[in-house]
Amino acid sequence: LKVHASSLNYHDLMVALGLIPTEDKRVPLSDAAGEILEVGKDVSKWTVGDKVMSMCFPNWVSGPPKYDLLSFIGDNQDGYATELISIPESAITKIPNNLNFKEAATLPCAGLTAWRALVDEGRLKSGETVLVQGTGGVSVFALQLAKTFGATVIATSSSEEKLEKLKSLGADPVSYTHLTLPTKSSG
């Protein structure tokens, strides 16, 4: 696979900080999009030139999630921070025709997490209200998906600048939040 675009998500930060253990010199990144340059002799699903993107949990195909199926590329095997990568045919899926490589590379983790929360689990309907917290990838995808479904989206952030960005993406009423941690009592 020739990697044309990759994206960073919270999982990649956790790996970089050592909070998800990996082998030394592991190539990071779990989300990418690219073009197939070669296929193995037993590959039947893909052909040279196909435009594909990574899958968040390539080992979880169906059914309830099980711990041993929830491993990521980028922690238990080398990831997409490379120009070329050899991966199993089950670890990728077709890029929708309306997306370019950069757009598709952002979908696998954050985009599908938002979709699962709002659509698969939440059964979101037009006219409902959704709260998104902060400006991370999942929140931004959730905001845009919810607006597409006709929902009102209330967004929160601790930054006025970030709230302006959320408004530009379609957030309705927004709320500025500032966390004040309690101090130790002197009594």
Each model region followed by its residue ranges:
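Glycine-rich beta-strand-centered segment in the early N-terminal region that forms part
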Residues: 1-6, 16-61, 76-79, 96-98
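Alpha-helix/helix-capping structural signal
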Residues: 6-8, 41, 90, 112
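Cytochrome P450 core scaffold surrounding the K-helix E-X-X-R motif
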Residues: 11-13
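NAD(P)H dinucleotide-binding glycine-rich loop of Rossmann-like/cofactor-binding domains
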Residues: 56-133
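Mid-domain Rossmann-like dinucleotide-binding core that forms the NAD(H)/NADP(H) cofactor-binding site
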Residues: 102-176
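Conserved small/polar residues in nucleotide/adenosyl-binding loops
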Residues: 177-183
